[in-house]
A protein has these predicted regions:
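Multi-pass alpha-helical transmembrane bundle typical of ion/small-solute transporters
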Residues: 1-159
Length: 159
């Protein structure tokens, strides 16, 4: 069974947009504009920017991966769904970091979610490589997870 790439892209683009929207809706606007309220507000803006960059990076990689294909296999579609499921959890942990900036659990949870999203993206890449002439660069699959694992380890060290 084959699925039209434009349908897969349309669905995925909608999910990516909803994820960023949910993250921005999690930002609490300050009730007063003194430093006690503005510092947490700017922290939430910072977390929103970081999370949006992660989502935007995955969106770019996703659109680039599917570029040039008219149809994809059902295995690619399933890997794509898992990819979106993991990314859909990103707003939850982003909000956790916004609400509890000194706690380690939301930070580690976010790192694990990004690792799982990257693993599912890698699976999607490999399913496409299995029926196309494109090669999969292993080096691109090593850099992201290593940097995320290092970031998670630094979260343990910093507490």
């Amino acid at each position: 069974m084959k699925i039209a790439t434009n349908r897969l892209n349309a669905f995925s683009d909608g999910v990516f947009a909803i994820i960023i929207t949910i993250i921005v809706l999690g930002i609490s606007f300050p009730s007063t504009f003194d430093s006690a309220h503005l510092i947490p507000f700017f922290w939430e803006i910072f977390i929103f920017l970081q999370s949006s960059l992660v989502v935007g990076s995955f969106w770019y990689m996703h659109s680039h991966l599917l570029d040039g294909y008219e149809y994809v296999s059902i295995n690619t579609a399933v890997a794509n769904i898992f990819h979106l499921i993991f990314l859909a959890l990103l707003p939850l942990f982003s909000r956790g970091i916004m609400q509890h900036p000194t706690e380690i659990f939301p930070t580690i949870g976010l790192g694990i979610i990004v690792l799982l999203a990257f693993a599912s993206y890698s699976a999607m890449s490999m399913t496409i490589a299995s029926y196309s002439d494109r090669s999969v660069r292993i080096s691109s699959f090593i850099c992201w997870p290593i940097s995320i694992i290092i970031a998670i380890l630094f979260a343990f060290i910093s507490t």
